[in-house]
Structures are given as structure tokens and as C-alpha cells.
């Protein structure tokens, strides 16, 4: 297929709960740095109390967003259920899932399509972006994720250096040309048909956030192909996905109801 002219081949999808500042940065990066800048973009906001709903209503036309807001879910759908909700609204061939606390580099979406065409083709499969993440937990390096000092690009939305990160990504792509057979649960491109076939996330895990492990096991058992590429890069603010409230890395939520997506 002609990848260059298929802006409606995919739909970007984000499910969020109280990630307003990071969500704004994520949406901005998708619209500015994606190859398919005008592709459909579904946002699902659940039980948000931090101004997310108001910001989405005010900016949905500016960013051409398809916005869905639920304010009093009990029990909550959680991130897995939110992904399922977003997927149910997709009308394009591909779904491109993102978390709310990411920043995407140039042409990340086009490179995922290229990877899918090359390694998955007509089979069932899902492809992923190389992740760059601030080293909040003193993690060990692993395939698919580069841990950098927290001050390298910034660990928060308010001190993130967009220009420096994009320069790093351009240089990284020049020096690294690799694919890895694995999944990373941040940015995943999958055919809508394949998502429906596997049944999406299992709601028995809601509203917790371990559902991707179960999803990947089911995909593996069904013969799905997994592949990750160095050509598609994203920054993942682990401070939010790791459930640190209010950007304070010294605190953790005490109640299940405080868990944020």
C-alpha cells in the first residue's frame, strides 16, 4: 500500500484519568510530530477532576479531537477498559494506542505502519515504538526502553525539553537501525480487526493496570507477531504511568480510587 498518502489508515487513541497537563503535551506532540497529522484522534476521559474535561471541550476543535467524557463511573473502566472504549469508536483499518503521559517524535506513526507492513503483513500482530524514559526507579536497561537521567530531557511536563529530545531522536535514528521481537505497553499499532479478534483488554482487571500482560499472553497464544522498531520513538513520563500523584516522586497513592491512568 502507499503509506505516504494514507492519513486515514489509522486512528490515534488515548484513554485518560486526571492527566491534564501531560495529556495536553501528548496531544500537541501527536498533531505536530506525526506524519499523518490529520488522522482521526479519539480521546476518552474518565472521572477527571483536574480540568481535563474543560480543556478537552475548549480545544477539541483546535486539535480535531473526537472526545468522549464520562464523569461518575463506579466501578471505573480503568486504562484497559478505556482502551476498549476508544477502540469501539475506531472506523479506520488501524488503531494506534497511546498513553496520556507520552511525547512522540517525528514520523513515529509512519514508521510503525512501515514496520507492520514489513513484519506483520496479512498475519495478525502488533508493533511498538522504542521508548525513552526518565530513570525514576534506577532501572536496568532492557530491549525497547532506554532509561536516561531524570534531568536529561526532564521528568515532568513543565521541564521537558522538546527541542533537545527531538534532536536526540533524529541522531538516534541515524545511528540505530534495529527491530526487536517484543512488546512495550506505551505505543502500539494494531489492526482494528485483530483487536476485535483477540477481544481487547479483559475487564476483570479493571481498574488496575496489569491488563497488558494478560493481553500479550493471549496474543502470543493466538500466534500474533510482535515487533518493535528504533525508527519510531516516544518519551514516556513514568512519573504519571507509575501513579505518582501531583508530580511528587516521593509520594504514592494510598487508595485504589487514587490510581490514575
Features from the language model and the residues they span:
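Short beta-strand-to-loop element that shapes/binds the nucleotide-sugar donor at the catalytic cleft/hinge
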Residues: 127-147
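A short, conserved alpha-helix in the catalytic core of glycosyltransferases
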Residues: 181-190, 194-199, 205-232
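A conserved acidic beta->alpha catalytic loop
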Residues: 45-54
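A recurrent flexible, glycine/aromatic-enriched loop bordering the glycosyltransferase active site
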Residues: 155-159, 165-190
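Glycine-rich, basic loop-to-helix element that forms the pyrophosphate-binding segment
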Residues: 72-90
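Short aromatic/hydrophobic "clamp" motif used to bind/position activated sugar donors
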Residues: 95
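Short, well-formed alpha-helical segments that are part of the catalytic scaffolds
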Residues: 19-32
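Conserved donor-nucleotide/metal-binding helix-loop-beta segment in metal-dependent transferases, i.e.
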Residues: 109-125
